[in-house]
Amino acid sequence: MPVAADAHDDASGDGARNVPVAADAHDDAAGDGARNVPVAADADDEAAATGGRDWTAVAHRRHPTRVCEAVGWMAAVTRSQLAQDLRDLGLRPGGVLMIHARMSALGWVVGAAETVVHALRDALGPEGTLVAYASWEEHVYQAAEWPAEHVAAHQAEPPAFDPALSEAVRDHGRVPERLRTWPGAHRSAHPEASVVALGPRAHELTRDHPERDGYGRDSPFARVVAADGQVLLLGAPLETLTLLHHAEAIAAVAGKRTVTFTVEVAGAGPRTYTDIDTTAGAYRYADLGLPEDTDPFEVIARAALAAGVGTTGRVAAAECHLFDAAALTAFAVAWIEERFA
């Protein structure tokens, strides 16, 4: 459904396993490491201004990830540079692209997340459609892990999921929320698995998100695959490939872990959803003997890259990976079925 009025839709302009792509817990609050905010002078700084304060040291202290160790600020990155790098990486003009981005990996982006969205749209062209995993900042089905006081307060006054208003999950960076609020954007009506899309195919990709099996065969993720879409990790880690949840959902394997949860939905009342478990994992990956602290989605993605499924390149300062959605899904389904079927 539309989430913003298309006043002038500028034609030029994930995460798997709920793993953050931000440098910290909140990419938009303090975690992206390349936020385009000035080093403001506080009272202490102002008082010491005439005392020879080392402003480079101040910058390092306040914004350590955006300041180079030897020369000061990270290199500036512009919209045109990003767009050209994206074209060189292999984005298909007029295509469907699902994006996972970590701003801090790119460098000091002039214009921040807004510039990134513009550059992605520049590379896709006016016929291209940009998609991002939005989910919801309220992780309702994880309530069993909350303190009893929080559960009671939530049950007393449960927030309603509203596709037009509810904030995208912060742990997946600033781009999904920036895209959600863009004029003409559409968001699917699922509190946990929702996606946001912008472009000519946005409504087609986000309509009728099923309440049961929200990552499955009739989900927006399946439609990205059917549309011959691509998936881009723009500096984001391999484990943030949300499309791999789609592979988990459609793999012919019995005994998948699932979760069922009820959410108040604006205008519709309480609704019950059943999905694969995207937090603990749909399968017992621990039984595979993977190295400790290794995310299985990273293992699958690296295996796909080694098999020639996907390409790796640089956009600005970031190492990036670009996958064909159908090829990645087919590889992941085969990988899962070989080990769990």
Where are these regions (language model features)?
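Arg/Lys-rich, positively charged N-terminal/basic patches that mediate binding to nucleic acids
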Residues: 56-58
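N-terminal and secondary-structure boundary signal
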Residues: 66-341
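Low-complexity, intrinsically disordered or signal/transmembrane-proximal segments
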Residues: 60-63
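Long, intrinsically disordered low-complexity tandem-repeat regions enriched in serine/threonine/proline
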Residues: 1-48
